[in-house]
């Protein structure tokens, strides 16, 4: 993969982003990478907040009842802390770091990554996985599932520069495929 990072900037050895709509397996892939000893940042847990995707300004205190389409609003304002991403990418302590998750402000940091992988599944698999999510997790409610199905169909809000990975395959095969594309295969 080509190195699209800005020249002259101290970076971690190799940094990769694993993205895809909710239900495609980002968390499962990240956990398997961790199990295999790789450094993983769960971006949706460690870096995310509700904010303006253009400015990064936090949007706190907005009540659900004040927004017409709450799931779409939450999705559009799910962003990562760009300064934290930059700091983690610059960390030289790990040979490879895998960032897992999705953010609406990915255009502000995607060029920092050595590679971007987009997990994709067929609609039946997506619907089956979403049906297993608890209601307190994004994708666990019918309105959220409808939004995710639309995003799956349109591919909007997904980086277009990524390598698409068929995540219908067994987890070990998916992870082996990603590692092989990173030159990390055993």
Where in this protein do the model-derived segments appear?
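Walker A/P-loop
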Residues: 27
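Conserved substrate/cofactor phosphate-moiety recognition/catalytic segment
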Residues: 31-83
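Conserved phosphate-donor/acceptor-positioning beta-strand/loop module used by diverse small-molecule
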Residues: 112-132
């Amino acid at each position: 993969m080509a190195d699209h990072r800005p020249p002259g900037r101290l970076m971690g050895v190799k940094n990769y982003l694993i993205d895809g709509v909710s239900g495609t397996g980002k968390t499962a892939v990240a956990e398997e990478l961790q199990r295999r000893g790789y450094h993983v940042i769960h971006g949706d847990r460690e870096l995310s907040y509700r904010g303006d995707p253009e400015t990064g300004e936090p949007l706190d205190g907005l009540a659900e009842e004040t927004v017409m389409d709450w799931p779409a609003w939450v999705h559009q304002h799910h962003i990562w802390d760009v300064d934290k991403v930059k700091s983690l990418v610059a960390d030289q302590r790990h040979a490879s770091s895998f960032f897992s998750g999705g953010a609406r402000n990915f255009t502000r940091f995607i060029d920092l990554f050595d590679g971007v992988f987009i997990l994709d599944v067929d609609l039946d698999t997506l619907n089956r996985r979403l049906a297993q999510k608890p209601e307190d997790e994004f994708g666990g409610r019918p309105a959220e599932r409808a939004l995710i199905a639309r995003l799956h169909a349109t591919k909007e809000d997904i980086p277009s520069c990524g390598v698409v990975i068929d995540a219908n395959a067994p987890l070990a095969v998916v992870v082996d495929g990603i590692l092989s594309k990173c030159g990390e295969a055993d």
